[in-house]
């Protein structure tokens, strides 16, 4: 059978023959373009794997010079280190982990391309500041060998210039502008350092506030002095719950003044969020932190604030996600970023316990927070003997937070079997706070648990209701706390749980976990 081509086949063949053939040059150009495209994709993949777009993570050793330089006390060296951290975070956008000594084991940092270990060696020369330091990149650390430090010997300069020079000569490029965080007048700067050192030890807070307040008058354009004064005032008011409401608006105004001068300053936003959370307004606290995080997406402190506010609102998945993101940026194994109470509420006891390790020189150690929560954890586990030891230790610290000292003493008396004496002290403390709209609903639930341990169910129920009214809305802990077990058969308890669930549901709708990924 003979196949005869159809007309349309012939026309297609004729058309294809009439088309011009691509030239050799065009083929070569096409091949070159394809190679460039494939190469570009490969390079982008390789850079992504190496983390070129990753944030710089800085491990900052803050107090190395204190032991060898008599011109700086340990607290002053740490205060200068904290100010260096603020400069690196605010101007560089870096994720900074602050430690007090070079880690004995550097394996965690070894091979990390975008990790910088930096040891400060500040010195005071008259009114000038010398910000010398040494650094080594994580990728340069070799197993079994001492770090190959690069030394930066600084010149003694007026303090503000010293900070600007540090940023200008930093191993990673930082956009340098005149600092808004360090006072330009040397005398004001050294007053600020002394006030910050007292804050770190929880000592002489009224004197520290007087120094900081004088600094705001002398240098009203310096954001750092306003933020420090707000920080000091916040700490002072927490020690005096009766004055919290009266002082809250003034403290907020101080921090907001700092934020106007230094928009998006992480520490100021964090402190302002604590004020909002402690007064039961976690919604505003979370809005503030999420907004600040748009400017500072790699800041661990902002994520700590989100975890704190979310925990108080009962948003445990959001709090846990914030903690995970924070620990990806900071080196939590070198220095816990916070007492991770969230993990106690979720049942992750080992992680909570890991956040309670001592940090010599840190406020969490000197304030009594760490031994108090070690005692609290032991109590949750049913180890009353260990709990008794830890509460006694917390109650005897010379510079502990007053609220921690008093509550530790009450728990100590309960576990010693002196319940009547404990009840009297607890009632006295309770009466001091009634009608004062005391801050911190989470602390109030600890008072409810103390009443329950003593056996006063009516007072415990009243205090648990007050904790809810003060903003502590973590339904899961109300339901899981072993100390609150005696209340769970009371009619008022079921009504309280219903109110908790309703409020928590509204907050869950407003702040889904995915917000952190979008933010």
Language-model segment annotations:
Residues 40-79:
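A structural "domain/chain start" motif
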Residues 195-203, 230, 235-242, 279-280, ...:
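Short coil/turn linking the two alpha-helices of tandem helical-hairpin repeats
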Residues 1-19:
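N-terminal intrinsically disordered, acidic low-complexity segments at the extreme N-terminus
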Residues 206, 281, 286, 290-293, ...:
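Alpha-helical protein-protein interaction modules
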Residues 71-103:
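N-terminal segment of the mature soluble domain
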